[in-house]
Amino acid sequence: MQFKAPKNNERYFWTSHVLGKMQYYGLSAQRILRVINNPVRKEEGIAEDTVAVMQPSSINKKKTWSSEIWVMYQLDTRPNDRSHSVGRETQRKIISAWRYPGISPEKNSIPAEIMEEVKDLIN
């Protein structure tokens, strides 16, 4: 199977690090975006101003799973040059992605208030 690198656009910026990790772990761009858009758990990333999101590798009705897919990204707000409206568009800079064998322990979860603010910025 040949690896096809995703292209950068106004919503997502793919770093070379995440492209290498995607190829190593056999993750597609669509799978990474699905983890970002529908995470089971959100935490603060280990790098400054980052968010880490997780989704089980196989989603079913069980509350236990054998491995997890993690994605770390950073929100980047820049003026939108293409539209004439006044406002800012949020771009997600996808930094890294990895598979975690087993179930990872919960660490610093992001409070619901902050997640609502992030959702308001995105929409």
Across the structure, where does each feature detected by a protein language model lie?
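Ribonuclease/tRNase effector modules and their secretory precursors
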Residues: M1-N123
